Amino acid sequence: MRPKNKVKTNRIVRHFRLRKKVIGNPERPRLSIYPSIKHLEAQIINDFEQKTLVGFTTKAKEFQKISGLKTGGNVAAAVLFGKFVAVKAKEKGISKVVFDRGGFLYHGRIKAFADAAREQGLSF
């Protein structure tokens, strides 16, 4: 029987393959990003304790107030969101992370997010 959505199935397979290699620890937690059609979501996770240290989304009122955007579905919003996440992570004392792209291609919004976070001093 064929899978209903081959693109989604392939992304999940890529994500499992990536997760075998990308592990967050207390010194370098994992920065996981999920792009939906209209928004972006990011979490900083310590995999050894299985705890989410910080979570962010473009739906948050704080981000929408700073950016003036209602949706985070484009590259410009991804750049602003990457800077926002890096600043908030620094406030929590997190400066080094392991980047988890979640099986999505390192292109477009994912690349813009990562480059903006690096510009603000988040190292990965």
For the regions a language model picked out, list residue spans one by one:
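Ribosome large-subunit tunnel/peptidyl-transferase-proximal elements
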Residues: 2-124
